[in-house]
Amino acid sequence: GGLGIEVGMEDGFVLVISPIEDTPAYKAGLKSGDLIMKLDSTAVKGLTLNDAVKLMRGKPGSTITLQVLRKGVNAPFDLKVTRAQIKTKSVKAKLVEPNYAYIRVTQFQEKTGEDLAKSLKKLRAENKFAFNGIILDMRNNPGGLLNSSVAVSAAFLKEGDLVVYTEGRAPDSKMNLTTSPENFVRNNPEKNNFLKDLPADIKDTPMVVLINNGSASASEIVAGALQDHKRALIVGTRSFGKGSVQSIMPMNNGTAIKLTTARYFTPNGRSIQGKGIVPDIVVEDGLSAIAVRESDLNNILSNPEDDEKKLKDAPEKPAKVKSVPTSDGQEALRNFKPIKLGGKDDKQFLEALNILKGIDLYKKN
């Protein structure tokens, strides 16, 4: 059993990149950017990430107490989490209203592209007519498999469109990934292309993509590709900014070294690393003032565009959010109620739906 979080290391502590939806960590109130200082009575300082992850795992139903340090909270606080078998559904889909589809992608797993295609076809048949709008929700999506992110992008872009490319010092670190089936179907791409039967109108349906500071890596690749090709409006808050490629180098003594060997770039040449994806329309979720991103971390891989005055074809960076007063961590937990994403209390989702309705009204007039 586990907790259901994507993690890294920062200053010797475990950094929560994103809690995965519907897992124990998400339900308990862990947030993107939290630092875990203790696992039960064991201090995290001095542990490797693998050692810390092993301590977080355990028998389903058993509990672990995490000591958490959160930006905007004046002292560390304890959070008890009950371990469980982590079985996440990477694609959730529904018609939120007639003619409006909502697709939630929580992670990029092996079957995510295929599940997305099935969901789109099912909703399209249920709706009977072409959609007036599609919302693709990748908030708190920590990433996953690169080929699955290409598949999700390919569902909405034209065949042959560039999704992402990488650049690094080593010649074999350079690659261009387009929406061609061979980049997301492992065996016999032409025969097994699960996107080939998608209704043609899906490619032209107005889209909004929702992101936040918990959207990292593969989800940033999808958002960047759809933004650069002007296929979708990006709504929410700036994403995490994890745009580096890691490679594992085996050593003679049976160990291995994990090295950062390249960076991801969007089709227009923007590096995701440390910058993230900036929304076309910023809609706060009430948590952005205490958000932590890759750019807030120490010793991060630099972005090659840091010295340029402006990112190529990137939207203007939104104004800085005012700092929030510190609060008591336990009080924050007592008041914590997870917002049902895609529900009536989800401000960002409701704004996305209003944007799509506005586009439809404009087209009709």
What are these regions (language model features)?
Residues 8, 67-71, 250, 265:
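A generic structural motif
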Residues 1-18:
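PDZ/PDZ-like peptide-tail recognition elements
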Residues 12-14, 37, 51-92, 260-261:
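PDZ-domain C-terminal substructure recognizer with occasional recognition of PDZ-binding tails
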Residues 91-365:
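C-terminal "post-core" interaction segments
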Residues 21-34, 89-92, 196-197:
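PDZ/PDZ-like domain micro-motif
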Residues 35-67, 148, 242-248:
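PDZ domains, with a preference for the canonical peptide-binding region formed by the helix
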Residues 25-48, 135-137, 228:
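Conserved PDZ fold ligand-binding element
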